[in-house]
Amino acid sequence: SFAGILDDADITAALAACKAEGSFKHVEFFAKIGLAGKKVFAIIDQDKSDFVEEDELKLFLQVFSAGARALTDAETKAGDSDGDGKIGVDEFAQMIKG
């Protein structure tokens, strides 16, 4: 949960900006919500494997709002620089920095 960590208006604005399929921009999204990389990674890595698997990333917008869309395959693969189907903390840091 992000209660007390993030501003609801920031979350709403960030989700609205990526509502259309293919419009999710990692760097812009995390800048809009104002959440640092390691905190985001820990929240998205639901199984605490130290990797964000594609299925976790695909549904991560729903962590912010239950009605949010799933990311497309292209959007989830954007951060997987070595193509292994999962994103490590270093890949994640690169992804959100741009």
Curated annotation (Swiss-Prot):
Has UniProt tagged this entry with the keyword Repeat?
yes
Q: Does the keyword Metal-binding apply?
A: yes
Gene Ontology CC, one term: cytoplasm
Q: Which residues carry this modification: N-acetylserine?
A: S1
Q: Residues in domain EF-hand?
A: 32-67, 67-98
Any idea which UniProt keywords this protein has? Acetylation, Allergen, Calcium, Metal-binding, Muscle protein, Repeat
Give binding positions for Ca(2+) 2: D80, D82, D84, K86, E91
**Residues noted as binding Ca(2+) 1 in the record, renumbered to the chain:** D45, D47, S49, F51, E53, E56
Question: Under the GO molecular function aspect, what terms does this record hold?
Answer: calcium ion binding
Additional detail = Is regarded as an important allergen. On the 2D-gel the determined pI of this protein is: 4.51, its MW is: 11.25 kDa.
- Function statement: In muscle, parvalbumin is thought to be involved in relaxation after contraction. It binds two calcium ions.
The protein's matches in PANTHER family, at most eight in alphabetical order, are given as: PARVALBUMIN (PTHR11653:SF12), PARVALBUMIN ALPHA (PTHR11653)
Would you identify the family this protein belongs to, as annotated? Belongs to the parvalbumin family.
Protein name from the UniProt record: Parvalbumin beta 1
